[in-house]
């Protein structure tokens, strides 16, 4: 199969699934060769989905029920902003169950796991604890290294290679809770359609894949490109601007640490009105739409504003924090 990839021939979904399983038992040299060859060829939706399904199937089993949402993005956009996906996941948990799958930061100064630590939110739940936490609070964080022990052999090779590989985009697609709804940020335009097609193959009910013209979130100051996935429908690609849903464009404020990110999220949840609020609201509106809570982005914005302004989301944050004490 390595020669096939080197010859720039695409793998089928089934071949990709089998290759992932084979890599778990290969030598480090072979793993490095396959990952490098795939990266050079460029991967397809079938290859992404095949790897992601195999990664899910090799994960620690967890059953959190149906109707779960996730807000994980690829990261790696090179910008240091507050952790939008974490803030959005807490807002979303005011309406539905959220199992946020994530890891410590690779390029950002405030990755999800880092910010959850700063917020004093429990992040090391085993499957039994995760079920109890999500049933009690509507929120749980699934720390990726705890749920993907099969990757222990592959991770050092990725680090040694020092290049981007298919694994850079697999994390958000490999949530072991198999979410029905998802908003997923990607860090390049060419991934929007591919990842959308991969999510369709993975059987998601509804999802949005977003690229914010340089950001792996919806951009608060520019157009964002979106792939909308609905089961039993063709995927749709379109652009959206903050003004389209009634927000004034604003530049995201840089963030220097997880602690700063946590403090700024709490400020917004406490009623502070500034650029951070608009950035969070824009992405929360999309998440509520992606999770079938809101009928469109404008209704999503209205709902997100309401739970911030009436104190519901701050109360939810305290409830989630208290659970881990």
Swiss-Prot record:
Name the record gives this protein: Anthranilate phosphoribosyltransferase
Entry binding sites for 5-phospho-alpha-D-ribose 1-diphosphate: 73, 76-77, 81, 83-86, 100-108, 112
GO MF, one example: magnesium ion binding
Pfam family membership, one: Glycos_transf_3
Cofactor: binding comment: Binds 2 magnesium ions per monomer.
Enzyme class: transferase
GO BP annotations, alphabetical order: L-tryptophan biosynthetic process
Pathway(s) served: Amino-acid biosynthesis; L-tryptophan biosynthesis; L-tryptophan from chorismate: step 2/5
Family annotation (NCBIfam families): trpD
Cofactor entry: Mg(2+)
CC terms in the record's Gene Ontology section: cytosol
Binding site for anthranilate 1: 73, 103
Positions contributing to Mg(2+) 2 binding: 216-217
